[in-house]
Amino acid sequence: MTEFIPFIILIGVAFVILSIILSFVPVGLWITAQFSGVKVGIFTLVGMRFRRVQPIRIINPLIKATKAGIDINIDKLEAHYLAGGDVNTLVDALIAAQRAEINLPFERAAAIDLAGRQVLEAVQVSVNPKVIETPKIAAVAKDGIEVMARARVTVRANIERLVGGAGEETIIARVGEGIVTTVGSATTHKHVLENPDMISKTVLSKGLDAGTAYEILSIDIADIDIGRNIGAQLQTDQADADKRIAQAKAEERRAMAVAKEQEMKAAVQEMRAKVVEAEAEVPKALATALREGKMGVMDYYNMKNIMADTDMRDSISKVAPNEKKYEEE
């Protein structure tokens, strides 16, 4: 029994070595490639292992391309994989382009994929146009009525401009700008409601797909509604603003009038003070005139009589209105 121990150990070591070799050498994948008509060396697959490339990610797409009649270099696929591209999607896009008779070289497809675009979706949109629906866009006609429109834009991907071309957001923004311009130039909102195709024709004629990754095939107005009366609202707001301005100016004038009244009252009080001051000087002047002989005694008494007569007249004038008031009561 002991004589079989070295043989068993040898078999175990051989099995371990074979397992290690098979983990680095994808023999099953190599056999599949050979039977699929893909000429790839076993050492090429081993090299992929050392370059941290999963051979199945390269060989399976290569088999699909070969079966579809597309000649692709395995080194290009590996380089695209190492650059972060999706090899499987790339090959699917090349096959779809070939079936649709679209000229799509490998280099352009790889550039589109590495640029972050969905290359397969781009090919599909080139064959089957895509419909982009815009949100409701509000615009105001010349008569002040708000018109809200929603459009459907049918686009086809432009393979030549996918790299560096603007996307759907730019298309939506340009269509919205065209709708606002067209509605804003309309004389009345009724004209827009009667001819909604006027919007699509005007917008389509502006060449909105310039510099984008899409080619606009048609623009259709899907829905159109009437919104607020912006003109009337603006006039109301302006009237309110004018009213507030007029009220502010009136309040300013009232304040100035009150201030002027207070100034006049102060001036009257000042004049009265001066009169009182002047009246206080009269007795002094009379005494001086009598003392210096400039005024006689009879003149003085005549003046006193005149003053008494004046006071009596003032008293009568003050009593008469009160008596009349009592008679009326």
Curated annotation (Swiss-Prot):
Cell membrane listed as a keyword: yes
Which keywords does this Swiss-Prot/TrEMBL entry list? Cell membrane, Membrane, Transmembrane, Transmembrane helix
Does this UniProt record's set of keywords contain Flavoprotein?
Answer: no
Where does it reside? Cell membrane; Membrane raft
User: TM segments?
Assistant: 4-24, 27-47
**Signal peptide, first to last residue:** none
Membrane topology, as annotated: Multi-pass membrane protein
A single GO CC term, please?
plasma membrane
User: Subunit composition?
Assistant: Homooligomerizes.
Q: Which HAMAP family match?
A: FloA (MF_01562)
Q: What's this protein's function?
A: Found in functional membrane microdomains (FMM) that may be equivalent to eukaryotic membrane rafts. FMMs are highly dynamic and increase in number as cells age. Flotillins are thought to be important factors in membrane fluidity.
So what family is this one in? Belongs to the flotillin-like FloA family.
Q: What is this protein called?
A: Flotillin-like protein FloA
- Give the source species: Alkaliphilus metalliredigens (strain QYMF)
Q: Which gene encodes it?
A: floA
